[in-house]
Amino acid sequence: MDIDPYKEFGASVELLSFLPSDFFPSVRDLLDTATALYRDALESPEHCTPHHTALRHVCLCWGDLMNLATWVGTNLEDQASRDLVVSYVNTNMGLKFRQLLWFHISCLTFGRDLVLEYLVSFGVWIRTPPAYRPSNAPILSTLPETTVVRQRGRTIRRRTPSPRRRRSQSPRRRRSQSRESQC
């Protein structure tokens, strides 16, 4: 079964894969952040949002994985095998948990649309050859200040006057000034 945990939120595993693995904070830091910001909502018996629900599930699954890791560490006598299990969990499963935690915390903090916009912006930035892209990657917390959102549909272009014609001081100009004063 190929299940994408981001699908219902408008994202995908592929979209998050553009972010390098060292981009994501540690699971411990992310869990501390989730607890500090959303403890009441996460512990509440009431349904808040799908992101809260997903965050609850990720936290519970991480707890179960840590219980399994503790059991393996206690019951596996061969140190080399123990190290292999720990390495596998940290490399593969740890990254998935860090991505999930980061995504849902970010969506709750910044809003889903902004996080998706950030993921797309970063994906475009990282795939652009270094010679043609800005030196700094997009930053999620500053995205609203720097992003130009273009609305779909036909854009209206103003024609600039040709250099041969001088713009006359016609009544049209005075009308536009009077419109401004009505606002």
From Swiss-Prot:
Modified residue annotations for Phosphoserine: S162, S170
Protein name per Swiss-Prot or TrEMBL: Capsid protein
GO biological process: microtubule-dependent intracellular transport of viral material towards nucleus; symbiont entry into host cell; viral penetration into host nucleus
Short sequence motif named Bipartite nuclear localization signal, residue ranges: 158-175
Residue ranges of the region described as RNA binding: 177-183
A family per Pfam: Hepatitis_core
Chain intervals for the UniProt region annotation (2 X 8 AA repeats of S-P-R-R-R-[PR]-S-Q): 162-177
